Swiss-Prot record:
Pfam families: F-box-like, FBA. GO terms for biological process: DNA repair; ERAD pathway; glycoprotein catabolic process; protein ubiquitination; response to unfolded protein; SCF-dependent proteasomal ubiquitin-dependent protein catabolic process; ubiquitin-dependent protein catabolic process. CDD domains: F-box_FBXO6-like. It is found in: Cytoplasm. This is F-box only protein 6. It comes from Rattus norvegicus. The modification Phosphoserine is found at residues 249, 268, 275, 278, 283. Gene3D superfamilies: 1.20.1280.50, Galactose-binding domain-like (2.60.120.260). It comes from the Eukaryota. GO terms for cellular component: cytoplasm; endoplasmic reticulum quality control compartment; SCF ubiquitin ligase complex.
Length: 284
């Protein structure tokens, strides 16, 4: 009877390409030194990436670590739940519910335009008082280990889409923060509010930001957006938002700009997320 370890290494590698990654790393790698060494070979993880469609053979961009690349591709998905209002306001925390409060409408809506992606059918709409909603993403609960987050520090790509009504001006707000296990803010993206005047083209606009080279210790992501109309009209005339996303991805930028971080020596900037809508100073 032939021992499996007597098979040529290329045959063993081919067998391993069909074994799920968790079993390879948690079980197979512990069997013997031969299996451990083969499972650590980058060729195996490149083959698995090709087999599962994470990459094509004609890829020009180099990959530093195929195992990390494969793991990140396996986990990659939108970490925000109900981004397109298909489940009304489910999964969102309402931080501010001004005017006539948040509402869900179907595209294109009154005095609106179609969304670029035809699969998106609905949007959230704000009113004449400030409307803000948010989600908190727990990265460990989503499958990202502390070691992966702290040593690899993969890119965190945040995107949001917003649009005004053609007949009413509005102001749109976005805030995204990376926080530690105890909710200390380590990096943030909070662009100036976008104000759009009345009698506009009602077009959908995308806003995007990539967190790269952020400090170690990131465990949570706070995503908050919303706004209000600028004319204080009763009803739902404020900015419309939909198709929001947070995706953790393999770093692709060759020289990515570092994330905006809060310096440790500046204790006045060390803030803790107490709730999705309020902040507390942690300095003595």
């Amino acid at each position: 009877m032939v021992n499996i370890n007597e098979l040529p290494e290329n045959i063993l590698l081919e067998l391993f390409t069909h074994v799920p990654a968790p079993q390879l790393l948690r079980n197979c790698r512990l069997v013997c030194s031969l299996w451990r060494d083969l499972i650590d070979v980058m060729t195996l993880w490149k083959r698995k990436s090709l087999r599962e469609g994470f990459v094509t053979k004609d890829r020009d961009e180099p990959v530093d670590d195929w195992k990390i690349f494969y793991i990140l591709c396996s986990l990659q998905r939108n970490l925000l739940r109900n981004p397109c209002a298909e489940e009304n306001l489910r999964s969102w925390r309402i931080d501010s519910n001004g005017g006539d409060e948040w509402k869900v409408e179907s595209l294109p809506g009154d005095h609106g335009t179609s969304f670029p992606d035809t699969k998106v059918k609905k949007y959230f709409v704000t009113s004449y008082g400030m409307c803000l909603k948010s989600q908190m993403v727990d990265l460990k609960a989503e499958g990202y280990s502390e070691k992966l987050l702290d040593t690899v520090r993969p890119d965190i790509v945040v995107k949001d889409w917003f649009a005004p009504r053609a007949d009413c001006g509005c102001t749109y707000h976005l805030r995204v923060q990376l926080a530690s296990a105890d909710y200390i803010v380590l990096a943030s993206f909070e662009p100036p509010p976008v104000t759009i005047e009345q009698w506009n083209d009602a077009s959908w606009q995308e806003i995007s930001h990539t967190f790269s080279n952020y400090p170690p210790g990131v465990r949570h992501i706070l995503f908050q957006h919303g706004g209000k109309d600028t004319q204080f009209w009763k009803g739902w005339y404020g900015p419309r938002v939909t198709n929001s996303s947070i995706i953790v991805s393999h770093r692709t930028a060759k020289n990515p700009a570092p994330a905006r971080t809060l310096p440790e020596e500046d204790t006045s900037n060390r803030r803790k997320i107490l709730s999705f809508g309020s902040w507390e100073d942690l300095s003595p």
